[in-house]
């Protein structure tokens, strides 16, 4: 289109099952004053983008780097520093979504006590999603934090150069590349199976590359 949408916030107002959203290459600096699409946990989590729309089986909603243009889209979160809140860049509650080919950089931490931020937070009810060739790097946040949902496929994604210099004296103890934390309390009613990390790489993260400490089952 000669009049593309400027933000994912606007995109989320209009997408429906079967739509393909092409993201042009370039760096998208999220402004400090952008209102979060939602907050969770009594306001503790500042969720920049809420991926709450769902596709259907065989008709996913796709968010893809534009294959007709050279270069990667980069979402730069370095200006987003909400006081006393944890930052989640992509809060995923929808199902049958396909995200591919972009970067998330510069995600911040503002709380000086025990805390964490996340680039992707996937929760119960988010099922049958595919995350491919996504890079989360050069920030203070966990790359992927999987808390719930079933049959989510995280494929060939990278998390690197992430270190939290702000909380707990800058020890960086909560910044994992990938976290799979589906436990018995978050599963409920037999949900929470079939999630796969495949071909993912993690390096130079200040805590674990892959953390399954709270996962009820891993194979």
Task: Give the ranges of each region predicted by the language model.
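Loop/turn elements at helix/coil->beta-strand transitions in domains of secreted/extracellular proteins
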Residues: 16-20, 59-60
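Right-handed parallel beta-helix/beta-spiral solenoid domain characteristic of secreted/periplasmic
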Residues: 25, 29-42, 47-115, 163
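Right-handed parallel beta-helix
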Residues: 24, 60, 64, 69, ...
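Short, glycine/acidic-rich beta->alpha junctions
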Residues: 3, 82, 126
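Right-handed parallel beta-helix/beta-solenoid
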Residues: 1-10, 14-17, 25-31, 67
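Short, well-ordered beta-to-alpha junction loops that form the rim of enzyme active sites
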Residues: 25-27, 33, 146-149, 212-214
């Amino acid at each position: 289109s000669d009049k593309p949408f400027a933000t994912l916030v606007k995109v989320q107002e209009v997408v429906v099952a079967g739509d393909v959203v092409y993201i042009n290459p370039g760096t998208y600096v999220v402004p400090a004053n952008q209102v979060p699409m939602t907050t969770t946990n009594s306001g503790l989590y500042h969720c920049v983008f809420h991926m709450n729309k769902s596709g259907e089986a065989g008709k996913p909603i796709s968010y893809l780097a534009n294959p007709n243009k050279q270069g990667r889209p980069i979402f730069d979160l370095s200006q987003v520093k909400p006081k006393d809140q944890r930052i989640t860049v992509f809060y995923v509650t929808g199902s049958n979504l396909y995200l591919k080919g972009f970067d998330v950089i510069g995600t911040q931490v503002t709380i000086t006590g025990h805390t964490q931020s996340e680039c992707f937070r996937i929760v119960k009810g988010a099922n049958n999603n595919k995350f491919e060739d996504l890079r989360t790097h050069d920030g203070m946040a966990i790359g992927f934090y999987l808390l719930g949902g079933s049959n989510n496929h995280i494929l060939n994604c990278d998390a690197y150069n992430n270190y939290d210099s702000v909380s707990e004296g800058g020890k960086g103890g909560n910044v994992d590349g990938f976290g799979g934390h589906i436990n018995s309390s978050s599963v409920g009613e037999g949900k929470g199976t079939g999630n796969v990390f495949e071909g993912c790489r993690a390096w130079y993260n200040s805590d674990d590359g892959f953390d399954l400490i709270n996962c009820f089952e891993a194979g």
